[in-house]
Regions:
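ABC-family ATPase nucleotide-binding domain "signature/switch" substructure
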Residues: 2-6, 18-119
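Short beta-strands and strand-coil junctions in structured, solvent-facing domains, enriched
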Residues: 10-11
Length: 131
């Protein structure tokens, strides 16, 4: 079930009318994290061959992000996936990572390669992951 895979069922079942609840301006307002989880669920329902994730986990706490990362593995399996992220935890397992600084690609490679050859990437990694 897509709602379980995207962890939407956790908040949907707490809504007044559960899956029948009207959301949006004239209904119940969702948090940023709930909106992101709902967007991921919608993407799972579409059978797209290309997935674009733009800051897909930026409004999530670390625990929920970890759960969503598992859901994203299912969503992106066998699909071309482009991930735009400032959180390195979102991209650590990517096949190829591009570092963009001031609109220019200043580095590319896998995580381990970038740790060795990019001071900028290493700096972000040390600040975010190795606290």
């Amino acid at each position: 079930n897509v709602s379980k895979l995207s962890f939407c069922d956790e908040f949907i079942n707490k809504l007044p009318d559960k899956y029948e609840t009207i959301i949006g301006e004239n209904g119940v307002r969702l948090s940023g994290g709930e909106k992101q989880r709902l967007s991921i669920a919608r993407a799972m329902l579409k059978k797209s061959s290309i997935i674009l994730l733009d800051e897909a986990t930026s409004s999530l706490d670390s625990e929920t992000e970890s759960k969503i990362q598992e859901a994203l593995k299912v969503l992106t399996k066998d699909k071309t996936t482009i991930v735009i992220a400032h959180r390195l935890s979102t991209i650590l397992n990517s096949n190829n990572i591009y570092i963009i600084d001031s609109g220019k690609i200043v580095g590319s490679g896998k995580h381990e390669e970038l740790l060795k050859k990019s001071e900028l990437y290493k700096h972000f990694y040390e600040r975010q992951i190795q606290k």
